[in-house]
């Protein structure tokens, strides 16, 4: 275990698998105390707690739906009770529903924006008073390539991610006076979501194979570490793409 985040407390939503899991393990290995949040899969949460313990780290795992303000407030209160502060927030929770623009129902549209965009809003708003009081904080949001270039079958997902990019820039501007940096990562990695998207495009468009190979989530975790540490103290309101080759 190294010490890039020694003494820091990080909250990571969508942390039970994929990118969130890789980031949680990376932060724990760098000395952070990590709160891992997921909407489902208590077994996966228990597993990541065990893995962090093997690293010599400290963690708590919680089930919560970030689209519900009450759930988010409960997470924040639990973290404060446990550790008394929150230094880093990673807004990674997300869902993916696939289908053409014409087929998207109002229910699907609202659910996707609720988890991605409203969830990012809820979590960010909940930690602002804490970070203001600390006069320091790091917030890392998640975009997607589809928000930048367009993609078949994910119009609602892309719209939510585009909103997160705009939200990131506005939050960064508003919170800069309190030494709170807000940045955004657009990751491409080998996760369950990319597998589902690849399969959908193959069936819908006749694409026989992946357009590219994807890196493992662990490969892009250092980008999150950069935005979580003092190395990025002079960087805010930025969006970077990671894992796209």
Regions found by a protein language model. Name each.
Residues 9, 16-17:
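Conserved glycine-rich cofactor-binding loop
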Residues 144:
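Residue(s) in the substrate-gating loop at a strand-loop-helix junction
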Residues 129, 173-177, 191, 233:
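Alpha-helical segment proximal to the catalytic Tyr-Lys
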Residues 32-47:
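Conserved glycine-rich Rossmann-like NAD(P)H-binding loop of the short-chain dehydrogenase/reductase
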Residues 124, 160, 168:
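Active-site helix of classical SDR
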Residues 100-101, 108-113:
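Substrate-binding pocket helix/loop in short-chain dehydrogenase/reductase
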Residues 184, 205-245:
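C-terminal helical subdomain
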């Amino acid at each position: 275990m190294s010490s890039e985040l020694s003494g820091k407390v990080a909250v990571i939503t969508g942390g039970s698998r994929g990118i969130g899991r890789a980031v949680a393990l990376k932060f724990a290995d760098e000395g952070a105390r990590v709160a891992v949040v997921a909407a489902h899969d208590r077994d996966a949460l228990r597993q990541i707690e065990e893995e962090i313990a093997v690293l010599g780290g400290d963690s708590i795992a919680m089930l919560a739906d970030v689209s519900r303000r009450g759930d988010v407030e409960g997470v924040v209160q639990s973290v404060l009770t446990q550790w008394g502060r929150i230094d880093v927030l990673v807004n990674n929770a997300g869902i993916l529903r696939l289908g053409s623009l014409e087929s998207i129902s109002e229910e699907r549209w609202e659910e996707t924006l609720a988890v991605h965009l409203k969830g990012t809003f809820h979590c960010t708003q909940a930690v602002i008073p804490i970070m203001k009081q600390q006069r320091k904080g790091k917030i890392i949001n998640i975009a997607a390539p589809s928000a930048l270039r367009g993609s078949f079958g994910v119009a609602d997902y892309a719209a939510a991610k585009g909103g997160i990019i705009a939200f990131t820039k506005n939050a960064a501007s508003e919170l800069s006076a309190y030494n709170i940096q807000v940045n955004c990562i657009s990751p491409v990695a080998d996760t369950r979501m990319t597998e589902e998207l690849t399969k959908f495009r193959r069936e819908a468009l006749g694409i026989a194979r992946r357009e590219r190979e994807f890196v493992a989530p662990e490969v892009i975790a250092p980008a999150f570490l950069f935005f979580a540490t003092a190395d990025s103290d002079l960087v805010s309101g930025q969006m970077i793409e990671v894992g796209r080759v």
